[in-house]
Amino acid sequence: MDQADGTAMIPPLVEQLRFTRSEWLRALRGVGEADALRRIEPMNSIGWIVGHLAWQEQRYFLTRAQRVTPVPLLDEVAANGGPPTTPSLRDMRAAWREVTGAADSWLGSLPARALSEMLPPPGATQTVGDAIQRVTYHYWFHIGEILAIRQLLGHPHRPEFVGDLETRAPYRAT
């Protein structure tokens, strides 16, 4: 569906992913480098979580969808099933910004019909829409993990509930 100015309307799934990313950043607000390096087993370090979500977005939206891998280091330090690592929060946030910036350009250009198209291999057989949903829900899983780690570390002023969803990413059918 196009907007009045002729530009494509961003699919609701993409809006929800963008809102979820903003909530994830809110969960990270106030986390310092030293705390992000700590690993309270069996949980991951916060630095790893940041890299891991960048890794997943890169894998789905850049490597598979566009055949580019701008931050190959993520495959080494934050891939699913890899050994536990404790990468620098600063480095992983920089990688996350690079990956999500590139992914956003692609996601923002997707017409709604593209969400039903298959995401190219390698990886699970899934549509682009399935991949966006999986990434979105994966963020929420790790938001909970980050907040649990922060609680164990005694961090005050943690987010306690979902932010302003109805204003920033309200429901719409198309």
Where are the language model's segments positioned?
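Hydrophobic alpha-helical core bundles mediating ligand binding, dimerization, or RNAP-core interactions
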Residues: 17, 21, 28, 96, ...
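Short, charged, low-complexity loops and linkers
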Residues: 1-13, 81-85
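Acidic/histidine-rich alpha-helical segments that form the ligand environment
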Residues: 80-120, 126-140
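Short, contiguous alpha-helical
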Residues: 2, 14-21, 25, 33-79, ...
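Surface-exposed helix-capping loop/turn segments at secondary-structure junctions
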Residues: 30-37, 105-116, 152-156
